[in-house]
UniProtKB/Swiss-Prot annotation:
<dbReference type="InterPro" id="IPR050063">
    <property type="entry name" value="Ribosomal_protein_uL29"/>
</dbReference>
<keyword id="KW-0689">Ribosomal protein</keyword>
<protein>
    <recommendedName>
        <fullName>Large ribosomal subunit protein uL29</fullName>
    </recommendedName>
</protein>
<keyword id="KW-0687">Ribonucleoprotein</keyword>
<dbReference type="GO" id="GO:0006412">
    <property type="term" value="P:translation"/>
</dbReference>
<dbReference type="GO" id="GO:0022625">
    <property type="term" value="C:cytosolic large ribosomal subunit"/>
</dbReference>
<dbReference type="InterPro" id="IPR036049">
    <property type="entry name" value="Ribosomal_uL29_sf"/>
</dbReference>
<dbReference type="InterPro" id="IPR001854">
    <property type="entry name" value="Ribosomal_uL29"/>
</dbReference>
<comment type="similarity">
    <text>Belongs to the universal ribosomal protein uL29 family.</text>
</comment>
<dbReference type="Pfam" id="PF00831">
    <property type="entry name" value="Ribosomal_L29"/>
</dbReference>
<dbReference type="InterPro" id="IPR018254">
    <property type="entry name" value="Ribosomal_uL29_CS"/>
</dbReference>
<dbReference type="GO" id="GO:0003735">
    <property type="term" value="F:structural constituent of ribosome"/>
</dbReference>
Length: 75
C-alpha cells in the first residue's frame, strides 16, 4: 500500500471529505491554467486525480463497512 493511502486511512471521514474538496478545487485551477497556457507542471494533475480517487475509495469502504455492521447488528 502506498504511503499516501496509509496517510489518508489515518484521517477521519470529515478530513477526507475536506481533502477531496480542496483537491478538486486545485485540479480545477490547474485545468484553467493549462487552458490558458500558464500551467508548467501538468503531471501534477495526474497525481491529484489519483489522490482524489484514493480518498473517495477509502470513504466508500468505510460507508460499506458501516452498512454491513448495521445490517449484521439488526439480525
Amino acid at each position: 500500500m502506498s504511503s499516501i493511502a496509509q496517510d489518508l486511512r489515518k484521517k477521519d471521514s470529515l478530513e477526507l471529505e475536506k481533502i477531496v474538496i480542496e483537491l478538486k478545487a486545485k485540479l480545477l485551477e490547474l485545468r484553467f491554467a493549462a487552458a490558458n497556457g500558464e500551467a508548467e507542471k501538468l503531471h501534477t494533475a495526474k497525481e491529484i486525480r489519483k489522490t482524489i480517487a484514493r480518498a473517495l475509495t477509502i470513504l466508500n469502504e468505510r460507508e460499506l463497512a458501516e452498512k454491513l455492521n448495521n445490517k449484521e447488528a439488526n439480525k
